[in-house]
Amino acid sequence: MSHVTLIGDRLASTGTEFVYEGESVACEGCPYRKQCLNLTEGVRYEITDVRDDGQLLDCAVHDTGVRAVEVEPTSVVANVATREAYAGGKAELPGSCPHTECPSHEYCVPDGAEFDTEYQIETVHGDPPHEHCQLDRELTLVEFKPPDTTSN
């Protein structure tokens, strides 16, 4: 389901993905709070449309202002334990990893997914980018289904 929100003008491009981090202290007293702070914290979104006819509004967070966009929750690609990697099944992230130089690190600690949270697997992609996990984990690359945010 699509949501209309405000986003920094530099980020306002169809296809841009971001994780909504919530309110900044600079948002206090802003007249656009209701239109801007209307997404679910920690969820990854994709901009599906930029309201070009919309006005560019001043913002204390974004130096070039904000504009209206349509966004939808989007999937998160992640590594999970191979034994849990079944399309339609549920899995959790395997746990934190200190090996930031590993080609799989962005999938072991993906933006838009939290540890100790179960996600539904939409697609199984297969082998992860790394050749060997330095933590000796057997991992498979999957895509988590976008969360249902209709309660927002």
From Swiss-Prot:
InterPro entries: UPF0179. Signal peptide: none annotated. Pfam families: UPF0179. PANTHER family: UPF0179 PROTEIN MJ1627. Belongs to the UPF0179 family. This is UPF0179 protein HQ_3004A. It comes from Haloquadratum walsbyi (strain DSM 16790 / HBSQ001). The lineage of its organism: Archaea, Methanobacteriati, Methanobacteriota, Stenosarchaea group, Halobacteria.
